[in-house]
């Protein structure tokens, strides 16, 4: 199984490292995450400037990782495009709580929704 891991708290968040490590037990993992915090971005996508991605300076043991100058939804779209087949997108582990009205603008949840829009299963935590 090919698992794409992302978040809205950035490539430097301890939550994404923990999620990527746990996901390794279930398949091949790739991390594609924002280069800076993108909390509360909702389903936003970048349309007014070029997107770039670079190998991550953060080391994820046994996992290929990239940072992106975009939103969580951008990361999912780019990550699934770069990887011919993606079976599952995991988004998180979020630093804060995604409860109640916060769900409407959660970048963490939006990444999982973006996966579904692209025909891939998505889970947010």
Write out the residue ranges for each language-model feature.
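Short glycine-rich anion-binding loops that position phosphate/pyrophosphate groups of nucleotides
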Residues: 9, 37, 71-72, 94-97
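Glycine/threonine-rich flexible loop motifs
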Residues: 97-106
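Nucleotide-activated donor-dependent transferases that construct or modify glycoconjugates
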Residues: 1-9
């Amino acid at each position: 199984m090919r698992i794409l891991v992302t978040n809205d708290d950035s490539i430097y968040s301890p939550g994404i490292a923990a999620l990527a490590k746990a996901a390794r037990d279930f398949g091949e993992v790739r991390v594609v995450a924002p280069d800076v915090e993108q909390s509360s971005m909702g389903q936003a996508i970048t349309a007014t400037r070029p997107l770039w991605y670079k190998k991550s300076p953060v080391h994820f043991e046994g996992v290929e990782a990239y940072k992106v100058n975009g939103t969580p939804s951008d990361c999912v779209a780019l990550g699934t495009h770069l990887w011919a087949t993606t079976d599952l997108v995991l988004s998180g582990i979020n630093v804060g709580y995604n409860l109640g009205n916060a769900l409407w603008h959660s970048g963490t949840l939006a990444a999982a929704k973006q996966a579904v829009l692209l025909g891939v299963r998505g889970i947010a935590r």
